[in-house]
């Protein structure tokens, strides 16, 4: 409810000309550091980090569980893109559900195994938690035509998600007032 209230407030303030605001609805962003953070979706990052580091991991959702995935790199690119959009051309459109990858846990494990080796699959076990599976394991596919038309994107596929999540890109920054942003995207 609080998210919808903020979206409504930003849209209303932008409509009145009080702010030049934008709101992005973010999916599960991976791969965060493996630290206790209280976030129920942390298992998504923990799975990726454990696999990459060759550590055993007990996944709290089933291999068939589906979730919305985006790398931190892709998320930052989308945030920068939102900041660069011409506010005058946006009109009333100020809220976007970002395009996401809709992947099962097994699809992510497949991509991890392709990069880090099939033998690491044996390090992953499954102990589905019904509550967590209900929250983060049954996400439906998303259609985001408005966001795509505005130039927002996802990681393209599971292999790119793994690469973008676990191999950080060069640092980027937003320009200071009066500065021009020059960004080059390198494909790993």
Q: How does the language model describe each region?
A:
Residues 29, 45-60, 117-125:
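A short C-terminal helix-loop "cap" of Rossmann-like NAD(P)-dependent dehydrogenase/epimerase domains
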Residues 44-58, 65-95:
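Alpha-helical substrate-binding/gating segment
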Residues 1-22, 51-52:
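Active-site Tyr-X1-5-Lys
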Residues 78, 82-135, 174-177:
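Mid/C-terminal beta-alpha module of Rossmann-like enzyme folds, strongest
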Residues 126, 139-149, 156-188:
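Amphipathic terminal alpha-helices
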Residues 48-51, 79-83, 112, 144, ...:
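Hydrophobic "lid"/C-terminal helical patch
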Residues 17-42:
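Flexible, glycine-rich beta-alpha linker
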Residues 75-79, 98, 108, 147, ...:
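Non-catalytic, hydrophobic alpha-helical segments
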């Amino acid at each position: 409810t609080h998210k919808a209230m903020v979206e409504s407030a930003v849209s209303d303030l932008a409509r009145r000309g009080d702010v030049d605001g934008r709101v992005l609805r973010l999916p599960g962003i991976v791969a965060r550091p493996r630290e206790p953070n209280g976030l129920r979706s942390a298992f998504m990052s923990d799975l990726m980090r454990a696999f990459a580091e060759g550590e055993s991991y007990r996944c709290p959702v089933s291999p068939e569980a589906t979730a919305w995935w985006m790398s931190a790199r892709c998320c930052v690119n989308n945030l920068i893109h939102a900041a660069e959009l011409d506010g005058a051309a946006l009109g009333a459109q100020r809220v976007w559900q970002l395009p996401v990858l809709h992947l099962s846990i097994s699809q992510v494990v497949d991509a991890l195994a392709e990069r880090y080796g099939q033998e690491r699959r044996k390090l992953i076990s499954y102990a589905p938690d019904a509550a967590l599976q209900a929250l983060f394991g049954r996400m439906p596919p998303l259609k985001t035509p408005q966001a795509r038309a505005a130039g927002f994107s996802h990681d393209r596929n599971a292999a790119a998600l793994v690469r973008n999540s676990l191999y950080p890109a060069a640092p980027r920054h937003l320009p200071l007032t009066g500065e021009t942003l020059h960004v080059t995207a390198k494909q790993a």
